[in-house]
Amino acid sequence: MGHKVHPTGIRLGIAKDWNSKWYANKAEFASYLAADLKVREMLRKKLAQAGVSKILIERPAKTARVTIHTARPGVVIGKRGEDIEKLRKEVSQLMGVPAHINVTEVRKPELDAQLVAESIAQQLERRIMFRRAMKRSVGNAMRLGALGIKVNVAGRLNGAEIARSEWYREGRVPLHTLRADIDYGFAEASTTYGIIGIKVWIYKGEVFDFSQVGQEKQDDSPRNDRNDRGDRGDRPSRPAREAR
């Protein structure tokens, strides 16, 4: 079933953390959720050129804290912080409470699945061959330390009359392993022939301690070979057979 479920949703609380962190009673839950969706939609539309990876929303004590993970923090902040102040006012208006906006830089965008998917989408819109775009992104991710990456594109590839899907993979992408730290991203490319969907899975290792989610993880060591089983302890030696 690893191929039929959202890779992030099935790992919440195991290897992934929530993008919205707040508690609401039954009467407020729907309005809070709708406000989160509107804020994310507005920010992604206004920051389309800023390389936004994800948007975290927290609601501590009748205020709101929005953290934007982006590959281009300068585009978000603007000249002397003018742009981010405008965003803060719009977010406060949408959420109905005072809002604070924090900006976090994504230092390795080649290892962020959402940014990789958006990069491939932009290349397809510039009429670059889809296979070249896929292989370039896969090569960059593996070069920067990913343990595995898979890219899937679907639609009227190269303007073909019949839509199809093609994928390319390097390394391991264990979708059935719940403790696997798999980053998932999706983007759409609007071409003259129609919409092309891009899905990206990036495997970064395994998570053994949920409290360390979001921090840098060490590469998982390979399993021992069957011959390397270590000492099995003292065993009584068998008596040698007498020659007949």
Swiss-Prot record:
MF terms in GO: mRNA binding; rRNA binding; structural constituent of ribosome
Region (Disordered), start-end ranges: 213-244
A Gene Ontology term for the protein's cellular component: cytosolic small ribosomal subunit
Domain KH type-2: start-end pairs: 39-107
Compositionally biased tracts (Basic and acidic residues): 216-244
Gene Ontology biological process terms, A to Z: translation
InterPro entries tied to this protein: KH_dom, KH_dom-like_a/b, KH_dom_type_2, KH_sf_prok-type, Ribosomal_S3_C_sf, Ribosomal_uS3_bac-typ, Ribosomal_uS3_C, Ribosomal_uS3_CS
Keyword Metal-binding belongs to the record: no
Keywords noted in UniProt: Ribonucleoprotein, Ribosomal protein, RNA-binding, rRNA-binding
The UniProt record lists the keyword Isomerase: no
Subunit note: Part of the 30S ribosomal subunit. Forms a tight complex with proteins S10 and S14.
Family membership noted in the UniProt record: Belongs to the universal ribosomal protein uS3 family.
General function of this protein: Binds the lower part of the 30S subunit head. Binds mRNA in the 70S ribosome, positioning it for translation.
Name of the protein described by the UniProt record: Small ribosomal subunit protein uS3
